[in-house]
């Protein structure tokens, strides 16, 4: 696991390198530029149509976006895997979840027709798509491959 997590300040937009040790100890990091508290979580973040741009498109890290719905059994099956990946990939990948029933604009933007769907995005651009419940090893393999690709090779 990396030694630091990159966290963008919601107030001034500065990218801050926060040691994972500090996060694991429950210490509250502050922005180096404006001194406001930084949002810290090794859990997936909840993304909405309204927050997609700030949370995903402007993320300094690649994003694994889990598109799901409450009624979807396979979505519930992979949810613990997505949570594990959020912890294991902290500092390398931002993991986010978007409920497609509550956020149809973003779901339509990416032409989501089947869930669960996991998208790997860089600067809001889709790099890879995994549809259906897959084992953690396959998701991790595809995620590692996608984040190593140059951004210009997106779909």
Protein language model features and the residues they cover:
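Short cysteine-rich clusters marking metal-coordination/redox-active sites
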Residues: 9-12, 31-34
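Cys/His-rich microdomains that often coordinate metals
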Residues: 16, 38, 79
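Short linker/helix segments within small regulatory modules
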Residues: 18-29
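A short beta-strand-turn-helix
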Residues: 45-63
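Short pre-active-site segment immediately N-terminal to redox-active cysteine/selenocysteine motifs
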Residues: 60, 67-71, 114
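Conserved redox-active cysteine motifs that mediate thiol-disulfide chemistry
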Residues: 67-81
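Thiol-based oxidoreductase modules, predominantly thioredoxin-like and allied folds used
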Residues: 79-105, 112
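Non-catalytic, surface beta->alpha helical segment in thiol-disulfide oxidoreductase systems
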Residues: 114, 119-152
């Amino acid at each position: 696991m990396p030694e630091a997590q990159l966290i963008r300040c919601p107030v001034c937009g500065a990218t801050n390198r926060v040691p994972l040790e500090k996060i694991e100890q429950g210490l509250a990091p502050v922005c180096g530029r404006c001194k406001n508290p930084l949002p810290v979580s090794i859990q997936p973040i909840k993304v909405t149509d309204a927050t997609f741009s700030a949370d995903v498109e402007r993320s300094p890290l690649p994003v694994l976006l889990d598109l799901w719905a409450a009624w979807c059994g396979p979505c519930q099956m992979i949810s613990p895997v997505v949570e594990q990946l959020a912890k294991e990939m902290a500092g390398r990948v931002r993991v986010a979840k978007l409920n497609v029933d509550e956020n149809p604009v973003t779901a339509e933007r990416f032409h989501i027709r089947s869930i669960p769907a996991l998208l790997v995005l860089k600067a809001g651009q889709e790099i890879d798509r995994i549809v259906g419940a897959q084992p953690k090893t396959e998701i991790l393999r595809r995620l590692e491959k996608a984040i190593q690709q140059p951004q210009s090779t997106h779909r």
